[in-house]
A protein has these predicted regions:
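Hydrophobic, small-residue-rich alpha-helical packing segments that form membrane-like cores
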Residues: 187-192, 209, 223-234, 240, ...
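Positively charged n-region of N-terminal signal peptides that target proteins for export
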Residues: 1-4
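Bacterial N-terminal signal peptides
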Residues: 7-16
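A conserved hydrophobic secondary-structure block that centers on an alpha-helix together
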Residues: 237-249, 582
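Proteolytic maturation boundary segments
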Residues: 20-39, 265-303, 309, 315, ...
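M16 family metallopeptidases and their MPP-like homologs
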Residues: 40, 45-61, 67-69, 85-178, ...
Length: 969
């Protein structure tokens, strides 16, 4: 006991030291206009990430106009009275007319009048497109080398973000503040179509539909009950004036934050922020309404074509509540992916899966426990909801009664401490906690004291909070495996003409922006010598990366054999995830997990076509004890029959039901198109072989895999001479043939493969072209082509498909390179669109492939993007070794960004054209399509492409289910 208390005291002291260390580089202040500014320097980051966060989301919308927050997120990329304006004086009357027409459209009920108004809006939009440039904002961001330009909307916030080089700080601050001054919501009608496509995309997903139904029930009477994207009846009846009103109400500096994380200097940045964001005008915010919380009682059941799942939902709490940290800790006692009470149930195989989490929001919250029932392959049925509930409630009752072991509490506290130690490793983690703190009004200091509070939690306090929330009434909601999907509403294709904007139009804003001052781009390169490579014997290589941040190690053992040579190995790896250790008595899997967790460690297994992986993490001081346990598990894995049965049942159900699941059908269609009879769904291990697996076979498979060439990737603080004796090395390792790359089907003429599916709400349309053998000498040209084709909204594909024609929410086209030089590259394009737009989408995409639109004015911005991408290709400390090994396998003996720098500087638009002509132009195109046959004109496709459409059935893409029945009989 004294030893435990001493360890706990040392842990708290080390956390207090880390708190001061973790704060380093963080600055928090407010501008005079009320804008919150959070700056966090991280000089290990490859670039800078900037966020503008608005404390407003779907929850702040009027009930009669849902979807406004998300609409606004889309529209705030369209420019202002300066950005994107070619002639604002001429444009303004047209813009005002569009606003007025939408008011009339929203009020009208006669379909004919609405159609006439929609036509008028379309005509005005086309006129406006001739005197404006919605690409202006994206062009400027491309010019400064911005990457990941995007935004997202949730219930409680909206955020706009991207990364950029520190040298472009002033120009980034300028355009990100300018976008908030007098915004103009151009092409509103066209962008609505893109939102419709996004809505249809979610309607296509049974998982999204299950979540939608769950939220409707557990947040009844609150804005949280509806999707962020909005209700379909409101999406079809927009009012632009209400969007402007929403913007004017909530997008004010005293309701916003500017958050910057990365490699920059805060002191030199502050004056720039004051000059740019200080221009925004504050405004008094309206009071937010409160909503009564629904009584959570009773049971509900739905058929959604979704895997059987049961949810038990309890009243939770709001973000920032005094109990929040403790209740989240309680959830981790139930489920943390390793040692929680529900984790132990999962490990034993009593259920297919179970987990618990706290869904805390600004105005309300829920405590949610979910489970997927055990599937019995012999009975060919899932265990009943009642039986599943009994298993889960047994564990919840332990929490309610305060029957929580000291070891479990200590393990979860240790997990928190480790997460806190690793907190400073990634800039994205820093950004996420700052966004969360601002959104919910939490003191930033809480970030650094939360873990200290967790370490000081008493068992009595944990029990008090657990009883308080889990003793409340709860609602039970279940979904079953009925694959007769509920068909949600979809939004129809409108009759509007595509926009035809002025090409290469340059605004006054763009000309002025290019003249703004910028710093000197700092060039830093990866040094392969950061990773020490040593031979530990024949076919055994150590890749050693020192950890200079903390005492947490990561160790990956990669054996050179995978599913291709050992088809049952992935299943053995899955079983090892829950294995214990043979003995007298045997150590069960749940007890193995507990012992590993007590050492502050985690172990996982994985397998792909080429490799078998063992991944281990923990504290270096415990390396010997951790590896002792892992070695024993590897040599003598112990599996209970229920664990074997659970894996077999899950695989049986997966194979039995997959022909009816649209997401799996799409995957199988692509596999068939690319690999033919070698598709992963056809060339798969027979189920009878899985059915006959036992613990002895698992032991043999793991032992056999460990005889292949081994790469050891270590990041930690132990010196090599202390590390090597702990590794599970064996002699006589055989050479590896990995990585394995399956040869793809070669198409020598135009081909269309069509999988008809009347249940899909959105069609999936792919374009495939066989390529040439890969050589790193063509990397710059390939990257330039990909940037030109799919570099965000200025890329040819998205611009033609989405921006101009509103055919799809998602569209791209890229040249894909393999993992090995000499293997063939290939082009893959994609459009996700409504089935009634498929014919038009094929025509537009084929025009792009047949005669790629030429726009040499993009070259400057394109090269800036390539340089920035090269500069930010900096692997994290823990991924350096694997990344460098991959680059060397491709043929690089130095950092690719250094090797390719001169080629990027010398790049011309002719190089992009030549790459297109050599690899795309005139090559046979294979179209791969899944959609509703009632809405797709197959004859028109055949006429346009000059080839027959090959219709496929699910039976062609999957093996027969008869072998499943034969195995279990």
């Amino acid at each position: 006991m004294r030893k435990y208390l001493l360890s706990a005291l040392l842990l708290v002291c080390s956390i207090a030291f880390l708190s001061a260390q973790s704060r380093e580089g963080l600055t928090e202040y407010k501008l005079e206009n009320g804008l919150t500014v959070l700056l966090w320097e991280d000089h290990d980051a490859p670039d800078v990430t900037g966020y503008v966060v608005v404390r407003a989301g779907a929850v702040d919308e009027p009930a009669e106009y849902t979807g406004l927050a998300h609409y606004l997120e889309h529209m705030l990329f369209k420019g202002t009275q300066r950005i994107g304006a070619l002639d604002w004086e001429k444009e303004k009357p047209i813009y005002d007319s569009i606003i007025a027409l939408y008011d009339q459209y929203s009020d009208a009920t006669d379909p004919k009048i609405r159609e006439q108004l929609a036509t008028q809006i379309n005509e005005c939009s086309m006129r406006e497109a001739k005197i404006s440039s919605t690409e202006d904002f994206f062009n400027m961001l491309d010019l400064i080398g911005a990457e990941g330009v995007n935004a997202f909307t949730s219930y409680d916030l909206t955020a706009y973000h991207n990364s950029f080089p520190a040298a472009e700080m002033y120009r980034w601050l300028t355009i990100f503040s300018d976008r908030l001054i007098n915004p103009v919501f151009r092409t509103f009608q066209a962008e609505l179509e893109n939102v419709f496509e996004e809505y249809n995309m979610y309607a296509n997903n049974p998982s999204s539909q299950a979540q939608k139904q769950l939220m409707e029930d557990i947040y009844k009477g609150s804005p949280y009950e509806r999707d962020v994207i909005g209700l379909p009846e409101h999406l079809k009846n927009p009012r632009l004036s209400r969007l402007i009103e929403f913007y004017n109400t909530w997008y004010v500096p005293n309701n916003m934050a500017l958050i910057i994380v990365g490699d920059f200097d805060s002191e030199s940045t502050k004056p720039m922020i004051a000059e740019t964001f200080g221009r925004l005008q504050p405004k008094e915010l309206p009071s937010r309404p409160s909503y009564p919380s629904v009584q959570l009682t009773g049971k509900k059941h739905y058929n959604l074509g979704y895997n059987p799942q049961v949810a038990w939902v309890y009243p939770g709490l709001k973000e920032g509540d005094a109990d929040q940290d403790v209740l989240e800790f309680v959830c981790n006692l139930l489920y943390n992916g390793q040692t929680g009470l529900l984790d132990q149930v999962n490990t034993k195989g009593d259920v297919s899966a179970s987990y618990a989490f706290l869904d805390a929001r600004r105005n309300d919250g829920r405590l949610i426990v979910m489970a997927v029932p055990y599937y019995d392959a012999n009975q060919q049925m899932f265990e009943s909801d009642k039986a599943t509930e009994a298993i889960v409630m047994k564990e919840i009752d332990k929490i309610k009664r305060g029957e929580i072991s000291d070891d479990l509490i200590a393990n979860v506290k240790h997990m928190y401490a480790q997460q806190y130690k690793a907190f400073n490793e990634t800039p994205s983690t820093k950004m996420n906690v700052l966004v969360d703190a601002f959104t919910y009004g939490k003191p930033v200091d809480d970030i650094f004291t939360a873990n200290e509070k967790i370490q000081s939690l008493t068992k009595e306090e944990i029990a008090r909070v657990a009883k308080k929330y889990f003793n409340a009434d709860h609602m039970t909601i279940s979904f079953d495996e009925d694959t007769k999907n509920m068909k949600p509403k979809t939004l129809p294709k409108p009759n509007i003409k595509p926009l035809d904007p002025v090409k290469n139009a340059k605004t006054e804003y763009a000309e002025a922006f290019q003249k703004l001052p910028k710093g000197e781009l700092k060039q830093t390169f990866n040094d392969f010598n950061d990773v020490k490579i040593s031979s530990l014997g024949e076919n055994v290589t150590l890749h050693y990366t020192p950890n200079n941040k903390n005492d947490i190690f990561t160790l990956t053992l990669r054996y050179g054999v995978g599913e291709h040579e050992m088809p049952l190995l992935p299943y053995a790896a899955m079983l090892m995830e829950n294995a214990g250790i043979m003995g007298n008595p045997a150590l069960e899997g749940k007890d193995f997990d507990q012992q590993i967790a007590q050492l502050g460690a985690a172990v996982s297994y994985g397998c792909n076509d080429s490799y078998f992986y063992i991944s281990i993490s923990g504290e270096d001081e415990n390396m010997n004890k951790i590896m002792n346990l892992v070695n024993r598990q590897l040599l003598m894995p112990y599996l209970e029959q229920k664990q074997l049965d659970a894996l077999k049942g899950n695989e049986f159900f997966s194979r039995y039901s997959r022909q009816k699941r649209t997401a799996v059908q799409k995957s199988a269609l692509m596999q068939y198109a690319l690999y033919g009879k070698k598709s992963a769904y056809l060339d798969e291990v027979k189920f009878i072989d899985i059915w006959n697996m036992d613990g002895v076979q698992v032991q043999r498979l793991i032992a056999s895999a460990r005889t292949y060439a081994l790469d050891v990737f270590y990041c930690g603080t132990l010196p090599e001479d202390k590390l090597v004796p702990e590794l599970p090395l064996t002699e006589g390792m055989q050479p590896s043939k990995s990585p394995f790359l399956q040869d793809r089907v070669t198409y020598d003429k135009p081909t269309v493969l069509f999988l008809p599916n009347s249940n899909v709400q959105q069609a999936d349309l792919y374009f495939y072209i066989n390529g040439r053998p890969y050589d790193i000498a063509s990397d710059v040209q390939s990257d330039a082509f990909n940037q030109y084709m799919s570099g965000g909204f200025t890329g040819i594909v998205l611009n033609e498909i989405r921006v101009k024609r509103s055919m799809a929410y998602s569209a791209y086209g890229v040249n894909t390179t393999p993992e090995l030089p000499g293997k063939d590259c290939y082009f893959i394009g994609y459009v996700g669109t409504q089935s009634d737009k498929v014919n038009d989408a094929i025509s537009v995409y084929m025009d792009i492939l047949t005669d790629m639109p030429k726009d040499s004015t993009q070259l400057v911005a394109l090269k800036a993007a390539l340089k920035q991408a090269a500069q930010t290709a900096k692997p994290s400390m823990r991924s350096k070794a694997a990344t460098y090994e991959y680059w060397q396998r491709l043929g690089y003996n130095d950092d690719p960004s250094k090797v390719n720098a001169a080629a990027i500087d010398a790049l011309t638009f002719n190089d992009i054209e030549k790459f297109y002509e050599d690899n795309i132009k005139g090559k046979p195109v294979t179209i791969i399509l899944m959609g509703d046959p009632k809405k797709i004109d197959v004859k028109a496709i055949e006429k346009e492409l000059g080839c027959k459409v090959t219709k496929l059935s699910p039976a062609k893409l999957f093996n027969s289910t008869q072998e499943l029945m034969d195995a279990v009989m």
